């Protein structure tokens, strides 16, 4: 079973739909309606932390889930920022606000980015980013903007199955979005 943490975002159910297309059982819980003991009792095989309209500090249990890291985690947008915050990175205002805009990324080709073109277009909806200079040693960058490598588009933990993407793989205009979700579910 896949647990999706809903950070009160309209894109949450696009993620749920993609996960469902991979024939996965799904439970959706809002970020303020579940506790860590309840998550443990649900025994999810993986957790997806959704986008949302706030900062990681305002994202309910999202950061605590990352700190607990009981199962593999994929964080999307706010979920990605929550991963950064959980390990000590600063979350700052992006140099430019992106809402519904496409950008081209480059990536590591590993884990969630396995078997994908080296560069492809993604859709971004965010005004906050992980400050690259504060990324802790526990995390590594897996994706950046092709035209600005200081803007982090993907991260992963160096020893735990924790992955984050700043962009929205569930957006219809993001290339390879379903592949990224499928890669995570198959890790």
Residue ranges and their predicted role:
Residues 44-115, 181:
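Cysteine-nucleophile active-site neighborhood
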């Amino acid at each position: 079973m896949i647990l999706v943490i809903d950070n009160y975002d309209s894109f949450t159910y696009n993620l749920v739909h993609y996960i469902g297309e991979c024939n996965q059982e799904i439970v959706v819980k809002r970020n303020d309606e579940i506790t860590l003991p309840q998550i443990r009792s649900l025994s999810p095989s993986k957790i997806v932390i959704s986008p949302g309209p706030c900062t990681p500090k305002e994202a309910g249990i999202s950061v605590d889930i990352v700190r607990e890291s009981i199962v593999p985690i994929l964080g999307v947008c706010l979920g990605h920022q929550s991963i950064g915050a959980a390990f000590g990175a600063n979350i700052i205002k992006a140099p430019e606000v992106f809402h519904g805009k496409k950008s081209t990324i480059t990536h590591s080709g590993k884990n969630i980015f396995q078997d994908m073109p080296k560069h492809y277009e993604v859709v971004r909806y965010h005004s906050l980013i992980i400050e690259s200079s504060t990324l802790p040693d526990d995390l590594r960058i897996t994706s950046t903007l092709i035209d600005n490598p200081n803007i982090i588009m993907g991260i992963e933990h160096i020893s735990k199955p924790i992955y984050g993407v700043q962009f929205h793989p569930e957006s219809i205009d993001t290339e390879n979005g379903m592949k990224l979700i499928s890669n995570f579910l198959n890790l």
